[in-house]
Amino acid sequence: MAVPKRKTSPSRRNMRRSHHALTAEAFQECPNCGELKRPHNLCNACGHYNGREIVSVEA
């Protein structure tokens, strides 16, 4: 079984974990209804994408 030869220092441990951080989700306001939506995705509230209605949403 593989066993570490030396104890990993806190500095080295934290440098390894530096890439594990979560990134904030990107949202932008829908120009049609003002609801928040993901970029390059159609709006869930009104069904518009790129200024056109793609999906009709019944309210």
From Swiss-Prot:
Taxonomy, superkingdom: Bacteria
Q: Which Pfam families match?
A: Ribosomal_L32p
| Gene Ontology molecular function terms on file | structural constituent of ribosome
Q: Name one GO biological process term.
A: translation
Say if the entry is tagged with keyword Ribosomal protein: yes
Q: What SUPFAM superfamilies does the database record attribute to this sequence?
A: Zn-binding ribosomal proteins (SSF57829)
Ordered alphabetically, the record's keywords are: Ribonucleoprotein, Ribosomal protein
Question: Cellular component GO terms, alphabetically?
Answer: large ribosomal subunit
Does the record's keyword annotation contain Lipoprotein?
Answer: no
Q: By its UniProt entry, which NCBIfam families does this protein fall under?
A: rpmF_bact
Question: What's this protein's family per the entry?
Answer: Belongs to the bacterial ribosomal protein bL32 family.
- HAMAP family per the UniProt record, alphabetical: Ribosomal_bL32
Q: What is this protein called?
A: Large ribosomal subunit protein bL32
